[in-house]
UniProtKB/Swiss-Prot annotation:
Keyword Methyltransferase in record: no
Keyword list, A-Z: Coiled coil, Cytoplasm, Nucleus, Repeat, Sarcoplasmic reticulum
Chief place of localization: nucleus
PANTHER family referenced in this protein's UniProt entry, alphabetically: E3 UBIQUITIN-PROTEIN LIGASE TRIM36-RELATED (PTHR24099), FIBRONECTIN TYPE III AND SPRY DOMAIN-CONTAINING PROTEIN 2 (PTHR24099:SF6)
One term under GO cellular component: sarcoplasmic reticulum
Domain B30.2/SPRY intervals: 513-711
Tissues in which the UniProt entry reports expression: Expressed predominantly in heart and skeletal muscle (at protein level).
InterPro entries per record: B30.2/SPRY (IPR001870), B30.2/SPRY_sf (IPR043136), Butyrophylin_SPRY (IPR003879), ConA-like_dom_sf (IPR013320), E3_ligase_FN3/SPRY (IPR050617), FN3_dom (IPR003961), FN3_sf (IPR036116), Ig-like_fold (IPR013783)
One Pfam family from the record: SPRY
Protein name: Fibronectin type III and SPRY domain-containing protein 2
């Protein structure tokens, strides 16, 4: 009955091995377990636990060779997918498909595996049966703050305890970001150090190569010098030996000659001795006969002086060896050779001022130089025929700023390198040029309108310059203060520049050449309010006088010239008039003329090539308003090509406004005081025109320009 009950209670796990036991659920909190796992959950949990244990054992004993050495039968096993692991010990067929082989059932296999596990781990069967797989505990809450004092991550709930209560903490994300920044900084430093070390290693390699090159060069230098010294010594040895041999030959020849002479004398003495001995054996009579002759012969022989002194001494004079040239060669042997010729660089842009230039040169890297000798002289035309003075200066660097020069002048430079071995060859000559002198703006020639300005200047340099630059500074608005606009590449001494209307500008001019830029010229101020112009004194009739400010024309009461003035293309000779210089800009130009009520005058415009021998308005190149006062009556004429309309003006104007409108091809006159329109010419202006003024009688008129256009004029 008990076995049947066990079979009924163990439904679903009847195939489990008999020696495999589980602890009863009574070991745990049964009430809690019942609440968490209602129903048959305890049975299911035991099955899952047993299946996991089987999988663990199967993984551990997958090595067939190891199992064989232990004396246990090997099992061909493979890792099984946990999702496909059998849930019931009774599913034997499914277990066979999952990898159990050898003809054994799952119960026998599991039992053998457990026996092997107990054997290899040194456990008894009872000890194995006490093994319990604990339940997985819930994961702890991750740390979300970082204790800066302890330098460890903690949870928020722990920072209120005694351990971290007084410590400084920060959010874990912020600490992580800070740590990443520190790591990044250290990595950057490390990368920089790596780069520096790589550069240093490259530099060391270059130094190694340089050492080898210098060694080879010095070795070649020593070999060359010492070979020269040996050749010199060998030559001197040959010369001395040859001279000594000559002296030896001379001595031997002298001694040999003396030896021959001595032998001859000795033979003569012996002959005389033999002759005397023979005479002594002769008879007395014969002896006396021969004795007289022999006596004379002996007397003559004895009178002959025999030189017994040596003609040549065997000793040789001590020879003084002159090694001065060898010493010079020895002194010339240095560790460094004489430098090569320097290479003088071309002039760099903007490297000069009006009185100085910066000269640069380079030298071969393997040359050692102690100083440089820089020489220069001005470049002049060959036609001048004057000797050019040369100047020399010693410098230590490979550059030099030469001062006290003439502006906008070319100079020829060359350089020599020197060290203790000697000077180098001279470099090639290079031409440098000083910057120009600052130009001078002709303030009296400035012409402007609301849209542009025409400025002229004098170069201030004897030699031509490459170009000019005009600098403009707008001086009215605070936000534009100090902002400089430049117009560059101006080839001539004048420029027409577009500007903004109703502003004030400060203008400077600079001159440029290959050497650099000159200093700024003196400033000139320009206002783009109305049209501003000056009177052209070259066109002024001799009877007229222009005031110092250039805006008042005066005709004094003087007698006329008896002789007529010769014709001129620029100066008025018949009409007592003068022209103004209006800026050549097609637009609207306005100016005013103040006149006396009874003054005879003519105002208007005319082309530049208007005939100077004709009255204004008497040709097709001039448009004028003429006023004459006759018999207490005012007469006004608007003349063009000697024609005038019939117009009567009741109010004599004291200030006449003139509006020149190129766009609409009109020339209008106004009475400024009463804002009255007087007359308008409709004229086709194919060329630029200029204001013109004439006085028929003595008096003066004043020109007002550079003023804003009145409102009543803007409607025309």
């Amino acid at each position: 009955m008990e076995e049947e009950a066990e079979e009924e209670s163990g439904l679903g796990r009847s195939a489990a091995p008999k020696d495999f036991h589980f602890y009863h659920m009574d070991l745990y909190d049964s009430e809690d377990r019942l609440q968490l796992f209602p129903g048959d959950s305890s049975r299911i949990r035991r099955e899952v636990t047993q299946a996991e244990d089987d999988r663990e054992l199967g993984d551990e004993f997958v090595d067939e060779h190891r199992l064989g050495t232990l004396g246990y039968p090997s099992y061909g096993m493979r890792r099984r997918d946990p999702g496909r692991e059998p849930r019931d010990w009774g599913e034997a067929a499914e277990a066979e498909d999952l990898g159990y082989g050898g003809g054994q059932g799952p119960l026998d296999q599991c039992q053998d595996l457990r026996e092997a596990y107990r054997y290899t781990h040194g456990r008894a069967s009872e000890e194995y049966e006490c093994y319990v797989i604990p339940e997985e505990e819930d994961e702890e809450e991750p740390a979300d703050v970082f204790c800066i004092t302890c330098k460890t991550p903690v949870r928020t709930v722990e920072k209120d305890f005694d351990t971290h209560k007084e410590h400084e903490v920060t959010p874990i994300s912020k600490a992580l970001e800070h740590a990443k920044d520190e790591v990044h900084k250290n990595m950057c430093k490390l990368e920089q150090q790596i780069i520096e070390m790589e550069n240093f290693a490259s530099h060391l390699e270059e130094v190694f190569i340089t050492v080898e090159e210098n060694f080879g060069r010095q070795e070649q230098n020593f070999e060359c010098h010492y070979n020269g010294i040996l050749e010199t010594l060998a030559q001197k040895y040959e010369e001395k030996i040859q001279a000594l041999g000559e002296k030896k030959r001379e001595k031997l020849e002298a001694l040999y000659g003396q030896l021959v002479s001595c032998g001859e004398n000795l033979d003569a003495c012996r002959e005389l001795m033999e002759t005397v001995e023979e005479m002594c054996h002769e008879e007395k009579v014969e002896f006396l006969k021969d004795a007289v002759a022999m006596t004379d012969r002996l007397g003559k022989f004895l009178k002959t002086k025999t030189d017994v002194e040596l003609s040549a001494q065997p000793e040789f004079e001590d020879q003084t060896l002159d090694f001065s040239d060898v010493e010079q060669l020895m002194d010339a042997i240095n560790t460094i050779p004489a430098p090569s010729a320097p290479v003088i660089n071309p002039q760099a842009p903007n490297s000069a001022t009006g009185s100085s230039v910066r000269v640069c040169w380079s030298l071969y890297s393997d040359d050692t130089v102690e100083s440089y000798q820089l020489s220069y002289r001005p470049v002049q035309d060959s036609s001048s025929g004057k000797d050019r003075a040369e100047f020399t200066m010693m410098v230590k660097e490979t550059y030099c700023s030469v001062t006290n020069l003439e502006p906008n002048t070319q100079y020829e430079f060359w350089v020599i390198a020197q060290n203790r071995t000697g000077p180098s060859p001279c470099s090639e000559h290079a031409v440098y040029m000083t910057a120009p002198s600052p130009p001078s703006i002709k303030t009296e020639a400035i012409r402007s309108c609301e849209e542009a300005v025409l400025i002229c200047w004098e170069s201030g340099n004897l030699n031509p310059v490459d170009s000019y630059t005009v600098e403009l500074i707008q001086a009215e608005t605070p936000e534009a203060s100090g902002v400089t606009e430049s117009v560059v590449g101006i080839p001539t001494c004048e420029s027409l520049i577009q500007l903004q209307p109703r502003h004030s500008y400060t203008i400077y001019v600079r001159a440029l050449n290959v050497g650099g830029t000159s200093a700024r010229s003196e400033p000139a101020t320009v206002h783009t309010t109305g049209s501003y112009f000056q009177l052209n004194k070259d066109t002024c009739h001799p009877w007229l006088t222009i005031s110092e400010d250039g805006f008042t024309v005066v005709r004094s009461e003087k007698k006329s010239f008896r002789k007529e003035l010769p014709p001129s293309k620029t100066q008025f000779t018949r009409c007592v008039a003068v022209m103004g210089n209006l800026i050549p800009v097609r637009g609207r130009h306005y100016w005013e003329v103040e006149v006396a009520e009874h003054l005879d005058y003519t105002v208007g415009v005319a082309c530049e090539d208007v005939p100077k021998q004709e009255d204004l308005g008497a040709n097709s190149l001039s448009w004028c308003m003429r006023h004459t006062f006759v018999s207490k009556r005012h007469r006004y004429e608007f003349l063009h090509n000697k024609m005038t309309p019939d117009i009567r003006i009741t109010v004599a104007p004291r200030k006449i406004g003139v509006l020149l409108d190129y766009e609409n091809a009109k020339l209008s006159f106004f009475n400024v005081d009463i804002a009255q329109h007087l007359y308008t010419f409709s004229c086709q202006l194919h060329q630029f025109v200029h204001p013109c003024f004439s006085l028929e009688k003595s008096g003066c008129l004043k020109i007002c320009n550079g003023i804003s256009m009145p409102k009543h004029v803007t409607f025309f």
